[in-house]
From Swiss-Prot:
The gene is ycf4. It is a multi-pass membrane protein. The chain crosses the membrane at residues 22-42, 57-77. This is Photosystem I assembly protein Ycf4. InterPro entries: PSI_Ycf4_assembly.
Length: 184
């Protein structure tokens, strides 16, 4: 989603609150909870959950391994739910031609650097760079090349844009900022 006028362009970034993250966090939670319950059932020697007969699973080694996988899965699921709750990676890119300033803001993990805020002058922007790697794991990234700071990614690699959409976005942004486009 974006908002645009003659002198200001704002691009909003979604972050980690995406449908796929909700889906995987939920599936991982249920799967790891199932593993932990089966491991606990094999330890106790009775069915905690009636779907799986635990008498067929011996605690050592199968029950221990299933309990370990269940605990590990719960930790990973907790991590995913925390990133969704904190909305890590969301923010905005603001390009202001009137003031000649670019502001990039992203939410990070809680702590000292929770708010990631970059600010620099438009005259320091050297180019807009497109990096395209085709193949099995295709990767299309849009960067902004800044004098003295290197390349700053503007579009995340997990956003599934086609090559045409990336080129269109790069062309619009380069036209707005009045800088050249580089393709790698």
């Amino acid at each position: 989603m974006s908002w645009r006028s003659e002198s200001i362009w704002i691009e909003f970034r979604t972050g980690s609150r995406k449908t796929s993250n909700f889906f995987w966090a939920f599936i991982l939670f249920l799967g790891s909870l199932g593993f932990l319950l089966v491991g606990t059932s094999s330890y106790l020697g009775r069915n905690v959950i009636s779907l799986f007969p635990s008498q067929q699973i011996i605690f050592f080694p199968q029950g221990i391994v299933m309990s370990f996988y269940g605990i590990a899965g719960l930790f990973i699921s907790c991590y995913l739910w925390c990133t969704i709750l904190w909305n890590v990676g969301s923010g905005y890119d603001l390009f202001d031609r009137k003031e000649g300033i670019v502001r990039i803001f992203r939410w990070g993990f809680p702590g000292k650097s929770r708010r990631i805020f970059l600010r620099f002058l438009m005259k320091d922007i050297q180019s807009i760079r497109i990096e395209v790697k085709e193949g099995i794991s295709a990767r299309r990234v849009l960067y902004m090349e800044i004098r003295g700071q290197g390349a700053i990614p503007l579009i995340r690699t997990d956003e599934n844009f086609t090559t045409r959409e990336i080129e269109q976005k790069a062309a619009e942004l380069a036209y707005f900022l009045r800088v050249p486009i580089e393709v790698f």
